[in-house]
């Protein structure tokens, strides 16, 4: 294919569920490649497998792509001259092309039942052979075909794979790749109901939509020789292919939808309060890297930098720790109001903040979130981070390390003195808390960790956390006095 041909790439999901992280990466790399080359990014819906399609699957895919920050030049919702953009609406395009292959003797009708095919596969496996179709319907005469149809058999259509050919292509990621045609076997291009199979529809659509580059996951590489054979049968020029390495988990195993250790769907990250810009950034680095050590880039910077030559030849590690770090970098840059907006739905869902909160409660939420602004990695994290602000005094428990601190003989007088200081206050503000702690130090003669740690542990239930005077201010006078009093009564 000519390198000067206009870049046209596509993301072609099946509407079988939510947008998976692997599919999001495929879409993103195609998007970046198109935008970098001032080309076209197309969304095509591959919905011919009606049994697997789910309600709202198509809408969910596009909604989440938009949320991540991608737009496209053609698609179901952006009509163009290469439509329709749903494969289910392109049947009238596929049928004459299938017939053309039949007429040329490059395809044939196959009447084998699923049971026969399964028996054939099992026999091949038992003999240590690679399972593939034997071609037994390849040489049926017209009379034999008519007899089969008279008996009620409906044919599928199989492509005649030429013998003893080496199918070679230069891959953008893997360099030169070759397959032997003898290992492929005649493959189905139209099912018994006349619906084309994936490989046929994809090859036809990519050609008719003038797709210049096909950038997709490594799990598709075995489809590529079949698609090239279809291109060759019609005398078409194949696109340039690029097969990205798979995404693996920390055990270096291929990311599986059954792997519960990793959240794998964009919708879930969205629901947890991750930022789209951060996910865009993280996904863009899954199997691709820029020059240098920097890891945080804007969408515009990624578009400017993106070069498929920098796609990794090694599997891409999905690192949860890295993802939360990346998201935290973006959260830290947000204005506090935006972080409150990100956090509030999760506090409300947890039932610790009113669904219909008044201005005073909203002001309090601003103070609460400000304590964790630098630390928060995503919106929902505010709930576990701030749980000590909502706990009853009676429910607070201490671990062994905390108990050891509270067992020091000076602790009761520190807590008593601090309680007395707070009881004298009309308003609990951080500055007043600081002054109160200084007065406790003067009165008791206790300073440093022996002073601060018991106060922190008894008031917050934690040894570590936000700046103590600020945390006590946000807790509020009533709650703090209750916790101090409860501890004194029990010790």
From Swiss-Prot:
Binding-site positions, ATP: 257
Domain of life: Bacteria
Class of the enzyme per the UniProt entry, highest EC level: ligase
Keywords: Aminoacyl-tRNA synthetase, ATP-binding, Cytoplasm, Ligase, Metal-binding, Nucleotide-binding, Protein biosynthesis, Zinc
Record text on cofactor binding: Binds 1 zinc ion per subunit.
A GO CC term assigned to this protein in UniProt: cytosol
Biological process annotations from GO: glutamyl-tRNA aminoacylation
Short name of any one Pfam family annotated for the protein: Anticodon_2
Listed CDD domains: GluRS_core (cd00808)
Short motif ('HIGH' region): ranges: 13-23
Gene Ontology MF term list: ATP binding; glutamate-tRNA ligase activity; tRNA binding; zinc ion binding
Location(s), subcellular: Cytoplasm
Keyword Protein biosynthesis: yes
Catalytic activity, EC: 6.1.1.17
Coiled-coil zones: none
Cofactors (names): Zn(2+)
SUPFAM superfamilies registered for this protein in UniProt: An anticodon-binding domain of class I aminoacyl-tRNA synthetases, Nucleotidylyl transferase
PROSITE patterns: AA_TRNA_LIGASE_I
Positions occupied by motif 'KMSKS' region: 254-258
Binding site for Zn(2+): 110, 112, 137, 139
Assembly information from the UniProt record: Monomer.
Job of this protein: Catalyzes the attachment of glutamate to tRNA(Glu) in a two-step reaction: glutamate is first activated by ATP to form Glu-AMP and then transferred to the acceptor end of tRNA(Glu).
Entries under HAMAP family matching the protein: Glu_tRNA_synth_type1
Record-stated family: Belongs to the class-I aminoacyl-tRNA synthetase family. Glutamate--tRNA ligase type 1 subfamily.
PANTHER family: GLUTAMATE--TRNA LIGASE, GLUTAMATE--TRNA LIGASE, MITOCHONDRIAL-RELATED
Name by which UniProt lists this protein: Glutamate--tRNA ligase
């Amino acid at each position: 294919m000519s390198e000067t041909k206009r870049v046209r790439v596509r993301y072609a999901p099946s509407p079988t569920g939510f947008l998976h992280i692997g599919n999001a990466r495929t879409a993103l790399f195609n998007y970046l490649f198109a935008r970098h080359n001032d080309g076209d990014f197309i969304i095509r819906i591959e919905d011919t497998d009606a049994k697997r399609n789910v309600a709202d699957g198509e809408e969910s895919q596009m909604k989440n792509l938009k949320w991540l920050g991608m737009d496209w030049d053609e698609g179901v919702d952006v009509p163009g001259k290469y439509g329709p953009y749903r494969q289910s609406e392109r049947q009238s395009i596929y049928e004459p092309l299938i017939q053309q292959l039949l007429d040329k003797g490059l395809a044939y009708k196959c009447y084998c039942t699923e049971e026969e095919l399964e028996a054939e596969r099992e026999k091949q496996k038992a003999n240590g052979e690679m399972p593939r179709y034997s071609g037994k319907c390849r040489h049926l005469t017209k009379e034999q075909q008519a007899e089969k149809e008279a008996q009620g058999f409906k044919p599928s259509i199989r492509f005649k794979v030429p013998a003893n050919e080496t199918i070679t292509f230069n891959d953008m990621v893997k360099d030169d790749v070759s397959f032997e045609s003898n290992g492929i076997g005649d493959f189905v291009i139209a099912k018994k109901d006349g619906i084309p199979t994936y490989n046929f529809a994809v090859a036809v659509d990519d050609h008719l939509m003038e797709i210049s580059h096909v950038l997709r996951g490594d799990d598709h590489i075995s489809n590529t020789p079949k698609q090239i054979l279809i291109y060759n049968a019609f005398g078409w020029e194949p696109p340039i292919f690029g097969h990205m390495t798979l995404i693996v988990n920390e055990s270096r195993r291929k990311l599986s939808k059954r792997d519960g250790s990793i959240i794998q769907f964009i919708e879930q990250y969205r629901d947890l309060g991750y930022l789209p810009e951060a996910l865009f950034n993280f996904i863009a680095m899954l199997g691709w890297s820029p020059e240098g050590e920097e890891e945080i880039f804007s969408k515009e910077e990624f578009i400017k930098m993106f070069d498929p030559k920098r796609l990794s030849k090694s599997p891409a590690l999905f690192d949860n720790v890295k993802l939360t770090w990346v998201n935290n970098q973006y959260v830290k840059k947000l204005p506090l109001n935006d972080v409150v907006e990100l956090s509030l739905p999760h506090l409300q869902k947890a039932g610790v903040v009113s669904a219909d909160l008044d201005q005073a409660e909203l002001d309090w939420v601003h103070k609460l979130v400000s304590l964790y602004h630098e630390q928060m990695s995503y919106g929902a994290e505010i709930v576990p981070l701030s749980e000590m602000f909502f706990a009853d005094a009676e429910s607070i428990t201490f671990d062994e390390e905390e108990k050891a601190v509270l067992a020091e003989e000076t602790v009761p007088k520190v807590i008593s003195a601090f309680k007395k200081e707070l009881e004298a206050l009309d308003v609990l503000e951080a500055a007043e808390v600081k002054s109160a702690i200084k007065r406790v130090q003067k009165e008791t003669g206790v300073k440093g960790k022996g002073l601060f740690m018991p106060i922190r542990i008894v008031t917050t239930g934690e040894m570590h956390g936000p700046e103590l005077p600020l945390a006590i201010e946000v807790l509020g006078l009533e709650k703090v006095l209750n916790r101090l009093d409860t501890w004194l009564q029990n010790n």
